[in-house]
Amino acid sequence: VTASIAQNQNKDTSNSAPDAAIEVKNLSKIYQGQHGQPEKLALNDVSLSIPHGSFFALLGPNGAGKSTFINILAGLVIKSSGDAKIWGYDIEDQMRAARRSIGIVPQELNLDPFFTPRELMEVQAGLYGIAKNQRRTDEILDAVGLADKANSYARTLSGGMRRRLLVAKAMVHSPRILVLDEPTAGVDIELRIQLWDYVRELNRQGTTVLLTTHYLEEAEELCDKVAIINHGRVVACDETKTLLSKMDAKELNVTVAQTLNNVPDLLRGHGYNVNLIGENRLSFQYSPSKVEIGNILDLVSQAGLTVADLTTKESDLEDLFLHLTREDNAKIA
């Protein structure tokens, strides 16, 4: 079902896809202050190019400007300056074509409680001018796991079901780009997996996906490219693997057979940090470009310790996110 939806969605665009599904240049947004409050610079000269067919994550702390960025694409907020294009269409000069090219799943669970999912889907399709014989309401509801709730009132749906219904509504007009703003907030693990299976299949069939999430492990697993935004500015943008490789930080945990009261002196002063955890676990934080793991293990042996177990931990997207945002905050301060 998902494959047929995605194929229908992209069948007329494969020969005319632009290099960038979303492209913004020098985009800024200033909210005017009210009641004597100072103005707020929500986006500060943001430039981003999101390749068509990519699975792209836009990450940032609360108040970083992510929602403002998405709301500008959706036409809910007017930009102060800069340019933005969706599928090659300018969001102001070619507004209708731009809107037809994008489906947005909002963060807020805003649904009419007195309509059923089927009715909400039909209304949404009507707003986009989709002929009744071209609508795929039941297909999409089945794909997001709501076929058995199609005729239930929206007010009776759980939070996770409402979230999936928002995804379904965003897909009624077969958009080339799907924007997901915190889509798995309040969704249990099983339904989260089902939702991501659906979105992954859409992406495999050519749909460009833009994701914002606070579940950084999701972004790391799903997305091939990541942009991190802080205080309205892009502080990093690259392929996920490339960004992680720049962290140059690993952790080695060595459990030894002996009981320790402190870190042996022989293990100190070699260009890494080492801490004793409990009575027999040594935790080493080191830079792979400067220190080799074999050298650490040699020193452990020279200290007369017997290795009972060891584990390593690579830097993940959460480490990168915290590192870059803290570094940026320090520059601003």
Where are these regions (language model features)?
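ABC transporter nucleotide-binding domain
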Residues: W196-S287
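Conserved ABC ATPase "signature" region
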Residues: E122, G126-K149
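Conserved ABC ATPase signature
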Residues: Y153-L157
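Conserved catalytic motifs of ABC-family nucleotide-binding domains
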Residues: S174
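Helix-to-loop junction immediately C-terminal to a conserved catalytic motif
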Residues: A74
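Catalytic Walker B motif of ABC-type/P-loop ATPase nucleotide-binding domains
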Residues: L178-D181
